[in-house]
């Protein structure tokens, strides 16, 4: 039987030198305060009419997993993705992936029976593992057969978000969040409380750093006032006309696995229906997990994902395209522009209007980012080209990337909205897409 037990916290398990310096953290909140690091696990809030307030953060908790049963260990799977190389340890599993960096590989014990184990297998002889992703596999010629069950002991460190809160009495207090391997939530507030900052513990860290501090600088994404006609009136006139008149309107959401969840487009449709009560909206989805728009365009006739048959052939009035996977392609700017010019010509030929949905932020190192705050500007070439292409060609752009880039200002580490810890947004993450789409219709009358 698998058991998971909290053990010691990391500050007891990982040695480090005592910290004596104090690091200023630039940033203000609704109460015009300032957050400072004053120790390895100590923060100080200075602001308001009382204080300063010094608070101690509990170090991340180690979770021990004992006697996890595996019916068999697979052979090594050749893959550039660490979460696919072997058996995924239960503690670090998130959706179809595992969470990188959460697994404490020094803790791993693979044995023939539960408990102390009749036989303890040897890494490098009987099995091996990916220390970052928490996957393991048997080695040919070792003592573990291909059909043999094994029992596994391991430890991992989940994420946690604590909140610095100003309460009704004018005091600052710390609320500790609930640990979760991929999506730690923020602590709930009581009436009269204001969240000043969040402290994100992303896994096994030995001390707090500036990148763990997320002051609440904004309560929501700052919508820029539109100069001139509303976006939908200017860029989506036929769609808007059908929404107002009650003529049938067919919307096609086209994309990859993110679109395949059928979340953001459903929320968008529900909003449109409420905004335009007489509208007759039909929503279709064409989604291909793990693929790109390049893959769609390369599919032959008769394929389940043939572009001309499945996308153009649906004869939509409006297409919403979402391709986070396109952002990972190693392409030149000219290649991106050429493909989107082809798409635009195809859509205009059949009289279809188009909304380009920019992708969300994904695992930071996949984007060339080193942290989850101070990241307003998306560094990906693909996103920059989409913005420029849509502006030049007068295409509606729902800029979800821009909203994701400012989540840190709301005290939210964006990766905590990913169900798989990489690139699959949860419902809150999909709502950001929906809000990006809805913003295009801000100011458009319903009649």
Residue ranges of each PLM-predicted region?
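General small-molecule cofactor/ligand-binding pocket signal
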Residues: 128, 284-286, 398
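Polybasic, proline/glycine-rich intrinsically disordered low-complexity segments
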Residues: 179-235
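Secondary-structure transition/turn motif
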Residues: 59-61, 138-146, 177-180
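Extended beta-strand solenoid/passenger and fiber regions
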Residues: 3-133, 139-140, 157-165, 170
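Alpha-helical cap/lid subdomain in secreted, periplasmic
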Residues: 158-160, 266-282, 291, 297-446
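Extended Gly/Ser/Thr-rich low-complexity repeat segments
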Residues: 143-158
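Catalytic nucleophile-elbow at a beta strand-turn-alpha helix junction centered on a G-D-S/GDSL motif
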Residues: 248-265, 289-293
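Membrane/wall-proximal cationic-aromatic binding patches
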Residues: 229-253
């Amino acid at each position: 039987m698998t058991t998971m037990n909290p053990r010691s916290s990391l500050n007891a398990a990982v040695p480090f030198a005592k910290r004596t310096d104090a690091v200023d953290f630039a940033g203000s909140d609704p109460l015009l305060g300032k957050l400072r690091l004053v120790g390895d696990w100590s923060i100080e809030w200075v602001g308001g009419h009382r204080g300063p307030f010094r608070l101690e953060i509990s170090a991340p908790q180690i979770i021990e997993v004992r006697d996890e049963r595996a019916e068999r260990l697979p052979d090594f799977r050749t893959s550039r993705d660490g979460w696919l190389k072997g058996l995924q340890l239960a503690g670090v599993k998130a959706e179809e992936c595992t969470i990188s960096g959460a697994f404490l590989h020094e803790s791993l014990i693979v044995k023939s029976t539960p408990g102390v184990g009749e036989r303890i297998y040897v890494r490098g002889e009987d099995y091996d593992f990916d220390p970052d992703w928490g996957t393991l596999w048997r080695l040919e010629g070792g003592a573990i057969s291909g059909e043999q069950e094994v029992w596994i002991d391991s430890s991992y460190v989940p994420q946690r978000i604590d909140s610095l809160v100003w309460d009704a009495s004018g005091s600052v207090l710390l609320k500790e969040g609930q640990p979760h391997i991929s999506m730690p939530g923020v602590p709930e507030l009581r009436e009269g409380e204001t969240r000043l900052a969040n402290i994100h513990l992303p896994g096994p860290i030995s001390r707090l750093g500036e990148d763990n501090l997320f002051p609440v600088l904004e309560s929501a994404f700052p919508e820029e006032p539109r100069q001139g006609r509303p976006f939908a009136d200017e860029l989506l006139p036929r769609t808007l006309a059908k929404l107002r008149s009650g003529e049938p309107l067919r919307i096609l959401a086209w994309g990859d696995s993110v679109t395949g969840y059928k979340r953001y487009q459903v929320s968008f449709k529900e909003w449109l229906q409420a905004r335009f009560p007489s509208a007759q909206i039909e929503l279709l989805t064409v989604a291909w997990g793990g693929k790109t728009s390049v893959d769609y365009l390369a599919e032959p006739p008769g394929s389940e994902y043939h572009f001309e048959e499945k996308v153009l052939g649906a004869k939509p009035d409006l297409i919403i395209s979402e391709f986070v996977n396109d952002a990972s392609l190693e392409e030149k700017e000219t290649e991106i522009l050429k493909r989107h010019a082809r798409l635009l010509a195809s859509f205009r030929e059949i009289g279809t209007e188009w909304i380009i949905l920019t992708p969300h932020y994904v695992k930071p190192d996949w984007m060339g980012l080193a942290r989850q705050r101070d990241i307003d500007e998306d560094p990906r070439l693909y996103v920059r080209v989409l913005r420029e292409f849509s502006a030049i060609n007068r295409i509606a752009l729902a800029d979800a990337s821009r909203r994701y880039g400012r989540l840190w200002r709301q005290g939210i580490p964006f990766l905590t909205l990913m169900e798989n810890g990489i690139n699959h947004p949860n419902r809150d993450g999909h709502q950001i897409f929906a809000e990006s789409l809805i913003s295009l219709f801000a100011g458009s009358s319903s009649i």
